[in-house]
């Protein structure tokens, strides 16, 4: 009799850059869990079909990355409270009754990584660039840290305004046009995927000062294009999304397996692996 190994995956497009299989393989080894975790490309307009096929083939759970987080939100039969508020899902799990529950662990991953770097969020002036699913997923956890203000800006201003309106009852949040921002912020978070293409958001470099911390949700070998730009314009610190990735992955693993892996050791291994490429 052959024992079936539980299957997990990450869906995205592009997905070649993903380190999720590496992370979850290390998590499994660390916690003595038997599972397989793969990276899967889904067509830009074909996430639902790909996810249905995965779960029909006895997939247990999956992570979801750009550009499918809002598709996953609509795909799930049930949502956790934080996923419902985020309006985006980065983790899906097949329940015993066959239904699919959607969760969002991005915000927890981001906040824990910022705090790990000793970034002070309480009383800080925070700028979030981008107003897609990645941004919406982290706003409530950021507001829970009690910043003095949280500003959202986006290429399409109406999307930023919609997000600000959605969360206005949760804390001091405002939306601003990219072209009107000329002041510096304490914490600048780039939630767009521009760095994957070596591009920059159309916002003034005046957002950075010698007291600023830049955080790019994207990651790569060395500085991302956004963080390089931040450092060139005086930002004191610049962090990429690798720690956020490990943090949200640990939350996902906990949802799937009921065990919380240690993130610090895995992050060190991942950074070493990434820089060695």
UniProtKB/Swiss-Prot annotation:
Active site: 69 (proton acceptor)
SUPFAM superfamilies for the chain: Aminoacid dehydrogenase-like, N-terminal domain, NAD(P)-binding Rossmann-fold domains
Gene3D superfamilies recorded: Leucine Dehydrogenase, chain A, domain 1, NAD(P)-binding Rossmann-like Domain
Residues bound to NADP(+): 81, 130-134, 154-159, 217, 241
GO biological process, one term: aromatic amino acid family biosynthetic process
Domain of life: Bacteria
Keywords of the record: Amino-acid biosynthesis, Aromatic amino acid biosynthesis, NADP, Oxidoreductase
Annotated pathway: Metabolic intermediate biosynthesis; chorismate biosynthesis; chorismate from D-erythrose 4-phosphate and phosphoenolpyruvate: step 4/7
Binding site for shikimate: 18-20, 65, 90, 106, 219
EC class of the enzyme, as a word: oxidoreductase
Listed GO CC annotations: cytosol
Statement: the UniProt record of this protein carries the keyword Hydrolase: no
Enzyme Commission numbers on file: 1.1.1.25
Keyword NADP included in the entry's annotation: yes
Coiled coil: none
A Pfam family the protein falls into: Shikimate_DH
Family: Belongs to the shikimate dehydrogenase family.
Record's function text: Involved in the biosynthesis of the chorismate, which leads to the biosynthesis of aromatic amino acids. Catalyzes the reversible NADPH linked reduction of 3-dehydroshikimate (DHSA) to yield shikimate (SA).
Complex formation: Homodimer.
Name of the protein in its database record: Shikimate dehydrogenase (NADP(+))
């Amino acid at each position: 009799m052959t024992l079936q190994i539980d299957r997990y995956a990450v869906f995205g497009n592009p997905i070649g850059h993903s380190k999720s299989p590496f992370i979850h393989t290390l998590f499994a080894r660390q916690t003595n869990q038997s599972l397989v975790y793969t990276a899967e490309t889904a067509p830009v307009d074909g996430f639902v079909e790909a996810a249905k096929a995965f779960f029909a083939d006895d997939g247990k759970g999956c992570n979801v990355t750009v550009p499918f987080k809002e598709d996953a939100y609509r795909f799930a039969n049930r949502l956790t409270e934080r996923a419902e508020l985020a309006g985006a899902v980065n983790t899906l799990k097949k329940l015993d009754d066959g239904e699919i529950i959607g969760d969002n662990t991005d915000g927890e991953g981001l906040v824990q990584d910022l705090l790990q770097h000793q970034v002070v969020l309480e009383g800080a002036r925070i700028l979030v660039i981008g107003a897609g699913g990645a941004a919406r997923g982290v706003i409530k956890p950021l507001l829970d840290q009690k910043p003095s203000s949280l500003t959202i800006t986006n290429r399409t201003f109406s999307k930023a305004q919609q997000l600000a309106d959605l969360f206005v009852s949760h804390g001091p949040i405002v939306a601003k046009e990219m072209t009107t921002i000329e002041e510096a912020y304490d914490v600048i978070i780039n939630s767009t995927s521009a760095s994957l293409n070596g591009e920059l958001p159309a916002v003034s470099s005046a957002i950075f000062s010698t007291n600023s911390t830049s955080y790019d949700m994207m990651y790569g070998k060395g500085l991302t294009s956004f963080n390089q730009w931040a450092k060139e314009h005086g930002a004191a610190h610049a962090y990429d999304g690798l720690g956020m990735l490990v943090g949200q992955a640990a939350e996902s693993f906990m949802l799937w397996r009921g065990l919380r892996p240690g993130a610090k050791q895995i992050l060190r291994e991942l950074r070493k692996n990434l820089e060695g490429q």
